[in-house]
């Protein structure tokens, strides 16, 4: 069980760190250099979307970290939130795998790193979710 708990905390912590990191992505990768500034509404919309996504990813993952002990007991809600985040990461991994995450130039390493890490996190979260499903079935028997 220690390995499963380690996997749970690792995946939720990593998800939270991605949420925190995403707050700084527009500046780190100079998003605004690629956008025509005459479309200020577009820039504001992208900023709002990124900020809300980052806050939801970071906040939800923080909740999962705080509810870690509950997830390994009979608390169904914490498992359901974990399942929801698993679906999000599976969708993200599918997008990164089958659709180019962004043009590879000028920062190809970032696109490849996103592909590898989102696929790895999705697989790990899927494994943890399957373990939770097994635990829930065993409790009901």
Positions of predicted regions on the chain:
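Membrane-helix boundary connector in multi-pass membrane proteins
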Residues: 94-112
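Cytosolic juxtamembrane helix and N-cap/initiation of the first transmembrane helix
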Residues: 1-18
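Membrane-interface helix-loop junction between the first two transmembrane segments
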Residues: 24-36
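Individual transmembrane alpha-helices with interfacial aromatic-anchor signatures
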Residues: 87, 107-121
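Membrane-water interface at the C-terminal end of transmembrane alpha helices
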Residues: 118-139
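Membrane-interfacial loop-to-transmembrane alpha-helix junctions, especially the N-terminal start
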Residues: 8, 75-84
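Core segments of alpha-helical transmembrane spans in multipass integral membrane proteins
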Residues: 17-19, 26, 41-69, 83-91
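Juxtamembrane helix-break-helix junctions at the cytosolic face
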Residues: 61-79, 100-103
């Amino acid at each position: 069980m220690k390995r499963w708990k380690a996997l749970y905390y690792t995946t939720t912590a990593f998800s939270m760190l991605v949420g925190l990191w995403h707050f700084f992505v527009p500046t780190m990768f100079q998003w605004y250099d690629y956008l025509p500034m005459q479309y200020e509404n577009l820039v504001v919309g992208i900023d709002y979307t990124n900020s809300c996504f980052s806050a939801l990813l970071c906040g939800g993952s923080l909740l999962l970290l705080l509810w870690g002990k509950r997830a390994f007991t009979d608390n169904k809600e914490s498992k359901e939130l974990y399942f929801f985040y698993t679906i999000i990461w599976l969708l993200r991994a599918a997008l990164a795998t089958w659709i180019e995450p962004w043009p590879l130039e000028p920062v190809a390493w970032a696109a490849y790193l996103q592909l590898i890490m989102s696929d790895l996190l999705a697989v790990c979260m899927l494994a943890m979710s399957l373990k939770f499903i097994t635990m829930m079935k065993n409790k009901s028997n």
